[in-house]
């Protein structure tokens, strides 16, 4: 279900923030967010609960925590300035919210890139009901 929601959001907001995050993920991993990360493990994609399944899923958990710390921002919808050069993502000048959202996304994309070796296809499209353990705290 969360995968369908992500796809719908991406189709509606083609110029929005989620597409920016997808581009960062593509830069760092050479994989598109959909289908590789939109419903991976217990935390990659919309929402999250339970315990991260591996280091890749932990990147998404930390990203969720980063978003939770932002106050007065709309991290899933705000558009922010950024650039990249030879695989390095640089968050640009913008509002304080834009800078913080960009840094959350940049850190997650870098983390996913650094943990490509932990990526397991068995966690792609992982069903939410299998994420039963008590949720990890931020």
Swiss-Prot record:
Tissue: Expressed by the venom gland.
GO cellular component labels: extracellular region
Record: active site: 63, 105
Record's cofactor remark: Binds 1 Ca(2+) ion.
CDD domains reported in the protein's UniProt record: PLA2c (cd00125)
InterPro entries linked to this entry: PLipase_A2 (IPR001211), PLipase_A2_Asp_AS (IPR033112), PLipase_A2_dom (IPR016090), PLipase_A2_dom_sf (IPR036444), PLipase_A2_His_AS (IPR033113)
Free-text function comment from the UniProt entry: Snake venom phospholipase A2 (PLA2) that inhibits neuromuscular transmission by blocking acetylcholine release from the nerve termini. PLA2 catalyzes the calcium-dependent hydrolysis of the 2-acyl groups in 3-sn-phosphoglycerides.
Protein name per Swiss-Prot or TrEMBL: Basic phospholipase A2 DAV-N6
Originating species: Deinagkistrodon acutus
